[in-house]
């Protein structure tokens, strides 16, 4: 776990420094790293780990309740941001999106593999693809379209992109349909080596994007803690795992990786949605910084204690 924390810190700092030192090249490199993750590294990890998943009762129930919990988190974020705090429209949308989207791939996969093991990673991949994937493609894009200041693509285009231009969904479907012979043990082991590449690439991109937003005047580093970010900290890190625990209490056999992934910090995808629809990027960027810092500090404390 110490190496996970170190990788997060070092990768983010390299991204920050690179963007400040070579702004054009670093920005391009950060986007290429996200493309590499999306189209090259994550699909085979998802495929080979889903081939061997067995959907016993606890898995299916956990997935259904995970979707319900995410929906309730989004609703709670809306209640706090809109009727209660009366935040500006684009800020409220950023709060809701940042509450919905977890960093379950870049940070979640390595943490599940390190803390729990390979079998739990396979079940965690299912949760990530189905629960967090639906949260991104359906919930977050819908919120962006409803609250953003810029006109996004229409609903029909988003649906087509979800089904036909989503390599993670394609890999998931193929993995669920494929026979076990297509994912022998050595290939599963190799996929877990690829997991080690996710975090440095992902957090390099986070650091570069944050520095880019600072250069553009969107945020200041270190960011100031303000009310919208406090809401995200509560909904993402407290309410999300808390609701899943509460909803699953009557049931047994829920994979433990579900709870860990439900407690992951705000994902970089919140900034992607914010860019696309004109949400407040300061809020999304600061939510990433603060929620990730809290989770990393908690992990570091766990490492020191154990």
Where are the model-predicted features located?
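Alpha-helical transmembrane segments of multi-pass small-molecule/ion transporters
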Residues: 1-306
């Amino acid at each position: 776990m110490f190496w996970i924390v170190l990788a997060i810190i070092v990768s983010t700092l390299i991204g920050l420094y690179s963007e400040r030192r070579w702004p054009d090249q670093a920005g391009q490199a950060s986007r290429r790293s996200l493309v590499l993750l999306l189209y090259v590294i994550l699909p085979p990890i998802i495929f080979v780990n889903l081939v061997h998943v067995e959907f016993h009762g606890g898995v299916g129930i956990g997935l259904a309740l995970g979707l319900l919990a995410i929906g309730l988190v989004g609703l709670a974020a809306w209640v706090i941001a809109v009727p209660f705090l009366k935040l500006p429209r684009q800020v409220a949308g950023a709060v809701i999106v940042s509450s919905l989207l977890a960093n379950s791939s870049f940070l979640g996969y390595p943490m599940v593999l390190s803390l729990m093991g390979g079998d739990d990673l396979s079940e965690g991949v299912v949760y990530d693809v189905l629960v967090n994937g639906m949260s991104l493609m359906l919930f977050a894009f819908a919120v962006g379209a409803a609250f953003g200041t810029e006109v996004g693509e229409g609903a029909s285009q988003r649906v087509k992109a979800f089904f036909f231009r989503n390599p993670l969904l394609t890999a998931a479907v193929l993995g669920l349909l494929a026979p076990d012979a297509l994912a022998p043990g050595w290939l599963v082991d190799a996929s877990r080596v690829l997991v080690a590449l996710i975090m440095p690439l992902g957090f390099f991109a986070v650091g570069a994007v944050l520095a880019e937003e600072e250069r553009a005047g969107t945020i200041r580093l270190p960011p100031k803690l303000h009310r919208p970010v406090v809401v995200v900290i509560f909904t993402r890190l407290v309410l999300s795992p808390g609701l899943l625990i509460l909803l699953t209490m009557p049931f047994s056999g829920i994979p433990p990786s579900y709870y860990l992934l439900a407690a992951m910090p705000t994902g970089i995808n919140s900034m992607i949605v914010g860019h696309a629809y004109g949400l407040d990027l300061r809020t999304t960027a600061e939510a990433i910084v603060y929620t990730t810092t809290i989770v990393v500090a908690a992990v570091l404390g766990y490492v020191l204690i154990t």
